[in-house]
């Protein structure tokens, strides 16, 4: 029987189907980690792919934006819609969390509070009032009541913090299984008034970095979860109702595998596009530099001011470079408001979903 107090669960987690799926998920995750190292500046992947994850993770919570709106807003000084701001907050919280684990080598409750504060733009902290219940969106029926008292929330989160940061030697559990378990436990504690789902999904990828399964946070599960949203919530609740973990484990490991495959494909395409741009720009333009290539792939959109700062060149020079690259078919020039923006055609084609 399921109990939130019994964590990690004592159930038999490593069934034959789970072990089979676990091996496959690890294989593709390791391949993703390796191929990310083919990009000279891995910050490019964090910047571009985190925007996709931010969009998809927010969509699970019914915060809907388009990729194009998001990319434009990322380089525009004009006010964004509330939905765009929510998505930008997610990307900012993800970057914040990655910085914290890089600096401290661990993920504490204080770090989780900081991530959630960056996400929600408030400092409400852990829930202090009772009354939080999880309901079926369609029927309004209460399907789960998380811990109601602050003392219980703090105690359970302290235990979860210890689980995240222990050395996993006393009763070793595979790190991917640990990630799946801690995600369920965090969602079940539901420690915040708002932002639990998105904070939990940030914790997932940070945990993979913390355990060395990835170097940078580029496994973004949310696109898979958006496509299979009803099953995600059904299996979360199925564990609580029955204490059976296998279905939840298989679902999340499949999410890891499929997302890793998508990530491998995306990174390979970005790598090839960078090599193509590098070769053709170096061949045809005297102003070629690796810094220029990195800049063009750091974000799908750029503008004169940004290139001036990156390359430390004058406004006329930056404008000349971008206009010549537009004439050469590398960029697409678009006027938005009073500013000209330059869109990396190859990168945009890679990042915009085709389905």
Positions of the model-derived regions?
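FIC/Doc superfamily catalytic core
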Residues: 1-355
């Amino acid at each position: 029987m399921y109990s939130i107090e019994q964590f990690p669960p004592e159930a038999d987690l490593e069934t034959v189907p789970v072990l089979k799926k676990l091996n496959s998920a690890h294989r593709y995750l390791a391949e993703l980690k390796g191929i990310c190292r083919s990009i000279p500046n891995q910050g490019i992947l964090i910047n571009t792919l985190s925007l996709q994850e931010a969009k998809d993770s927010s969509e699970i919570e019914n915060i809907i934006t388009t990729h194009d709106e998001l990319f434009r807003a990322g380089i525009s000084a004009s006010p964004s819609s509330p939905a765009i701001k929510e998505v930008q907050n997610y990307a900012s919280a993800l970057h914040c969390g990655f910085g914290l684990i890089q600096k401290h080598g661990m993920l504490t409750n204080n770090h989780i509070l900081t991530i959630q504060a960056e996400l929600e733009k408030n400092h409400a902290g852990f829930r202090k009032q009772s009354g939080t219940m999880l309901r079926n969106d369609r029927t309004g029926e209460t399907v789960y009541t998380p811990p109601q008292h602050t003392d219980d929330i703090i105690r359970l989160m302290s235990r979860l913090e210890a689980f995240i940061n222990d050395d996993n030697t006393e009763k070793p559990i595979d790190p991917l299984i640990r990630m799946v378990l801690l995600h369920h436990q965090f969602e079940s504690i539901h420690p915040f008034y708002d932002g639990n789902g998105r904070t939990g999904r940030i914790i997932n990828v940070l945990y993979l970095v913390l355990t060395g399964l990835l170097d940078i946070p580029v496994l973004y599960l949310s696109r898979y979860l958006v496509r299979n949203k009803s099953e995600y919530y059904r299996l979360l609740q199925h564990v609580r109702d029955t204490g059976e973990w296998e279905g939840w484990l298989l679902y999340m490991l499949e999410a890891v595998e499929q997302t890793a495959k998508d990530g491998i494909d995306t990174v390979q395409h970005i790598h090839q596009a960078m090599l193509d741009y590098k070769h053709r720009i170096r061949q045809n333009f005297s102003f070629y530099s690796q810094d220029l290539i990195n800049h063009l792939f750091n974000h799908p959109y750029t503008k004169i001011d940004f290139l001036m700062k990156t390359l430390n060149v004058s406004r006329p020079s930056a404008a000349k470079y971008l206009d010549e690259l537009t004439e050469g078919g590398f960029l697409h020039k678009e006027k938005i408001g009073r500013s000209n923006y330059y869109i990396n055609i190859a990168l945009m084609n890679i990042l915009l979903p085709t389905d």
